[in-house]
């Protein structure tokens, strides 16, 4: 039997251009793509502030997971991508605000740059929908 896929879009201008969804649910699994710090208007928020950008990314991730019937408590893995590795601790503390009791597996890594040079951070998440 073929599993049904559900897709979530957040209106990012990049989603239709490059053929991606913000998040995809297949069965009980939800995968949230690299999430940039964009406001509802599609513009970068918190320019120069890695923790502010991380907070916005996690708000978008939370909305996507909930939009597909999941909960943040179902998150099993996150990835933090930074252009400045020295921002790791302040971004990780914001991550901790969202996941204190959940404590998913996590990877933090530095990248050279993102599509928009104002982005300091992107986050990804994988979740399981609890039964």
Where are these regions (language model features)?
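N-terminal presequence-like segments and the immediate start of the first folded domain
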Residues: 1-59, 63-76, 82-131
């Amino acid at each position: 039997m073929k599993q049904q896929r559900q897709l979530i879009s957040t209106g990012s201008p990049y989603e239709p251009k490059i053929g991606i969804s913000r998040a995809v649910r297949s069965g009980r699994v939800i995968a949230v793509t690299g999430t940039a710090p964009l406001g509802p208007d599609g513009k970068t928020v918190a320019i120069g502030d890695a923790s502010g950008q991380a907070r916005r990314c996690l708000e978008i991730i939370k909305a996507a997971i909930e939009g597909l019937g999941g909960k943040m408590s179902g998150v099993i893995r996150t990835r933090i991508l930074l252009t400045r590795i020295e921002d790791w601790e302040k971004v990780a503390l914001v991550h901790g605000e969202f996941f204190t009791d959940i404590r998913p597996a996590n990877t933090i890594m530095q990248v050279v740059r993102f599509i928009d040079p104002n982005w300091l951070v992107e986050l990804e998440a994988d979740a399981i929908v609890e039964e």
